[in-house]
Amino acid sequence: MATIYIVEDDVNIREIERYALKNSGYQVEEFECGADLFKRLESKVPALILLDIMLPNEDGLDILTKIRADKNTAKVPIIMVTAKTSELDKVKGLDLGADDYISKPFGVMELISRVKALLRRTTNAQEESQISYGNILVDNDKHAVYV
């Protein structure tokens, strides 16, 4: 099943997210800050990221901006999971490239449903971006053909 990264400094919330995702069949990796996340992104890109805004050392919105600016991670689906609940905060997160926004406290069933829905949409889009015929693969996103 898909690997999901959780970027959350609150141990209790991270534990709830991890438990819910693992019980839904996902593999989970956890990070307390952006520096740890970026180190891991160098070697493995996840299927989805759950990202808090209020993190130590680096704001989640800055992390979001950096993820979207990197061609290797630009299309990774990101759900902001944060205590910032104002309409302005939500609009800012979505405008910077978040795919969804969940306010804390959140319902675990809603979180899992949003993860599933986002993965369903993005997985289909990724599959459509690659076309194969025999031993030929055309990657429309990379404008490349592989034999």
Model-derived regions, located:
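Short, Lys/Arg-enriched segments at the junction into DNA-binding effector domains
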Residues: 2-3, 117-147
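Conserved sequence signature across two-component system core domains
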Residues: 7-8, 31, 49, 102
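Active-site T/S-Asp motif of two-component receiver
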Residues: 9, 51-52, 81
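Two-component/phosphorelay signaling modules centered on CheY-like receiver
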Residues: 10-29, 39
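Acidic, metal-coordinating helix/loop segments flanking the phosphotransfer/catalytic sites
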Residues: 30-48
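Hydrophobic residue at a beta-alpha junction
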Residues: 32, 55-58, 67, 88
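Basic, amphipathic DNA-recognition helix from helix-turn-helix-like DNA-binding domains
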Residues: 65-70, 75-132
